Amino acid sequence: MQHAAPPKRRVWLLGVGAVVVVVMLWGVVAWRDRDDSSATAATDGGGQQTAAEVPETTTTTRPPYDGWVDPLSSGEKWDVETDGYLTFRGNPTRSWYGEGPVPSDPQVLWTYPGAGGMCGRSSDGGNVSTWCGDGWTGNPNVFERDGRTWVSFGGYDYGLHWLDADTGEEIVDTYTTGDLAKGSMTTDPDGFPLSYKGSRDSNFYVVATDRGEQPEVLWKLNAYDYGVQKIWNDDFDGAALVIDDHLFVSGENSWFYIVKLNRGYDAAGKVTVAPQLVATLPSFDDQLAVDAPDRHWSIETSPTISGNTLYFANSAGLIQGFDISRVKDGVAPTRVFRYWTGDDTDATIVADADGTLYVGSEWEKGNARSKQVGQMMKLDPSRPDDPLVWSLPDQVAGKAGIWATPALGDGVVYFATNAGRVLGVDKVTGEVLWEKNLGSQTWGSPVVVDDTLIEGDCEGNLNAYDVSDPRVDPPLEWTVELDGCIETTPAVWRGRIYLATRSGQFYALGDPDDPAATTTSSSTGSATPG
């Protein structure tokens, strides 16, 4: 997603060899066992176990993973202290989309704000205009804390918001940044009352929410800090990851950051951080300077981690993977994977349980490389010299391709295109199993929870499809008609759906028998069964 580079500071020409800055760290990773198994002993008619009837005991418990993120956790709820949906696409492999049940007949339960809308003035391409609501990627966080369900998000009113998920009332006052707070927030996974969020004001914020009604910024990362030379823009759109006290965050200034947070509490019991820079990683290299000399090298993807490899992509289409296995020992990340899509790759990379990557890329430049490799693709990092497993084109006239992050299902990967196509694709072969056309822009990422596929369009329709058999054209379950284009990605949490639109409103949706239905604010939203 390209924005004109704001004329804030002179862009200096620099050598584009890989630059990595590292400081010594210490610490270990503690990984919890997962035990999803159950065993039932066989008995005879009198209730006594018999040797012939006692089945062999099996277990599905995985041993603790010695590394950053177990690849086998792909598709699973993030196994952390905080109970919730905590970051864009739910977990470090960007492959978990929320917890059901999914409403069967949703209606608007409440909207926020109660009057007016979340709107702010900002520039794009040198033109200043009013932006309302929330847009790409705009995936809310929903989590449990102190006996209460919270929902948090950034808005186009410059604000960071923390609401009661049952009522829409503010739990913590809005924190106002200096520009649009676009992108998706991350909530601390380890129980610390911290939120992590970027803004178009060139800052990435770490905010404490344990100071009563007033949020407090404990630390800011500025796009011009640490001596990096901004290449393109200075926004922070990507949703950070926090793992083992390390913050992983991407910048539109063309740099990626790893920071040791050193979280703790002071004598008064208030949360603290003492951040230390661990590494800065460039989104570019010398070859990219030849292939993409316009220097549009910003990172809008959220970081993805599978095993000990960190992945991100940039607006020139360069996908990189860095080995971070020894970062905690003070060893610099080393690049172990490189692939060039040829065009703007803003959709976040998704990793499956095999460590295979699913990538969506845009069709804007129309160059030979993007024409060759397509816009929907599967990559295998274990064969770095020839990683492309399959690809599909989306090369209609004008801007085309993928802004939405793909979703993984049962043997199927779901893609949504700029022009409104939604596709179910065989994960192994790349065969298109079925396709729908929603008729308008689909930038929100597909959401799959409890065999229901949810996708919004730019006419304000939030659509749900039955994908209990994902290999057949899924029937429509319901449509909710909202005001404004849906660019955001909804969050599903225990019978509710949360999202914002470009109308200026944030919505909570649920079934009519939801207890919150009696406190519905005035709204024009309505549900239409499929």
Question: In which residue ranges do the predicted regions lie?
Answer:
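Terminal targeting segments of Actinobacterial cell-envelope proteins
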Residues: M1-R9
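Compositionally biased, intrinsically disordered low-complexity segments enriched
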Residues: A4-A5, V16, T50-A51
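Intrinsically disordered, low-complexity regions enriched in serine, threonine, proline
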Residues: P6-P7, V29-W31, T59
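N-terminal export leaders
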Residues: W12-L13, G264
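Hydrophobic membrane-insertion alpha-helices, especially the h-region
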Residues: G15-G27
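C-terminal region of N-terminal signal peptides and the immediate post-cleavage residues
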Residues: M24-Q49, T528
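Extracytoplasmic/lumenal domain signature
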Residues: G47-D83, F88, S95-W136, N141-D237, ...
